[in-house]
Amino acid sequence: MLDKFIQYALHPVILISVLSAWLLIDSPFIFFGTVIGLHVVLGTLEYVRPARQAWVSPALNKLSALVLVVMLFVASTMVGVLYDNQLLGPLSQVSGLLGLNFWPHSWPLLVQAFMIFLASEFIWYWIHRAEHKWTFVWRLSGHGAHHSFKQLNALNFGLNHPLELFFLALPAALIGMLFGVGEAALGATILLVTQASIA
């Protein structure tokens, strides 16, 4: 029964739970809490029901991955602050000049989150293609670090080179700043993208 749940229902349950938490809990720590909670749930499931027994990671590997996850979380927060400080002013001016500040704030948050998700994933798709197509972009972004793991698990799935965080955060930042997206919709989208990637 647990195996069937994991196979067919875990991913939708995770996404619904994360979006529900975002909608129902008003806390600045919701992102951090859901990421940690999801890592605990998936890490426990990997231990209890590993997809392959050979993939069970030694404790030292899990600890080092956990340290890297925390470091990258801090680094990604700093990238977000840097983008806010350096890009918000110029992109707001461009948005005003081109009349792009028309975001539908009155629409349901879930609809807004999926709109941002689709638009940012479209941009990210082309960035990701460029990373794989051109050696220069591959090296500049450090994308190879993401592909260096031989066994993926809940902790190392999204470990990227710190430089790649600039590329990862760029699509949502551009959309948010150009179209006047509200903080709640942008935050819900970041949670959605993160949890979809983990699960």
Regions inferred by a protein language model and the residue ranges of each:
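Short, hydrophobic transmembrane alpha-helix segments
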Residues: 18-30
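Membrane-embedded catalytic scaffold of the fatty acid hydroxylase/desaturase
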Residues: 67-199
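Hydrophobic, membrane-inserted alpha-helices
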Residues: 13-20, 168-174
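Membrane-helix interface linkers and caps
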Residues: 38-65, 84-101
